[in-house]
Amino acid sequence: MSDEKNKFTDASFENCDLKNPVDRDTLKKATDEFLKTHEAEIHSEVKEENNEVSDPLAALQDENKELKDQLLRLVADMENLRRRTARDVADAKAYSIANFARDMLSVSDNLNRALEAIPEGAKENDAGLKTLAEGVEMTERAMIAALERHGVQKIYPEGQKFDPHFHQAMFEIPNCDVPDNTVQQVVQAGYIIGERVLRPAIVGVAKGGTKGVPVESGSA
């Protein structure tokens, strides 16, 4: 377009007399013709100049969007980490004594076996033996109470529907008066801590009754 500009300003117009109507009209026509001929090119140059001005703004907007996306992802990751950490801490707190509690249950079992080994009527005939038995009973109850304060719960599911997640069936008891798989006898109580089974309840279940009567398993 620079060559055309030179043509427009060449010597043929340098001697124009603007006071002369003919020259003035000639110059006006030449100017209009020039603008009409090069209007598209002029608009293109203006558009390019505008684009050059707006490009940095668009780049900044794109960069801002990318940084915002990165920030949102970082916030989401931090929130997930916070929740996972809180869950891990809660689990560690709830289950930290699980192994210790399981060992204490064995002690409780031994205390109960000791009590069961005392012959019927022996305590009534021996004051010392009676006092000893009462002391053992108190010790066993205190131990279980201490475990319960730390989240350990006893399972004694007699009369409930057998649940393989919490119960272990050792034998069947023929009984047509109750639904199949109803716990008829508890040989050994079970224990849970939180949602984990420390020890399943050892049970005997009914066999021969009607089916399909749901009885939820729970702890006593």
From Swiss-Prot:
GO terms (BP aspect):
protein folding
Q: Name one GO cellular component term.
A: cytoplasm
Subcellular locations according to the entry: Cytoplasm
TM regions (residue ranges): none
- One Pfam family in the UniProt entry: GrpE
Q: Report whether Chaperone shows up as a keyword of the record.
A: yes
Gene Ontology terms, MF aspect: adenyl-nucleotide exchange factor activity; protein homodimerization activity; protein-folding chaperone binding; unfolded protein binding
For this chain, the annotated S-S bridges are none
User: Sorted alphabetically, which Gene3D superfamilies does this protein's record hold?
Assistant: 3.90.20.20, Head domain of nucleotide exchange factor GrpE (2.30.22.10)
* Principal localisation: cytoplasm
Arranged from A to Z, the UniProt key words for this protein are: Chaperone, Cytoplasm, Stress response
Per its UniProt entry, which superkingdom is the organism in? Bacteria
Function in brief? Participates actively in the response to hyperosmotic and heat shock by preventing the aggregation of stress-denatured proteins, in association with DnaK and GrpE. It is the nucleotide exchange factor for DnaK and may function as a thermosensor. Unfolded proteins bind initially to DnaJ; upon interaction with the DnaJ-bound protein, DnaK hydrolyzes its bound ATP, resulting in the formation of a stable complex. GrpE releases ADP from DnaK; ATP binding to DnaK triggers the release of the substrate protein, thus completing the reaction cycle.
On subunit structure and binding partners, the annotation says:
Homodimer.
Similarity remark: Belongs to the GrpE family.
Q: What is this protein called?
A: Protein GrpE
Which gene does this sequence derive from?
A: grpE
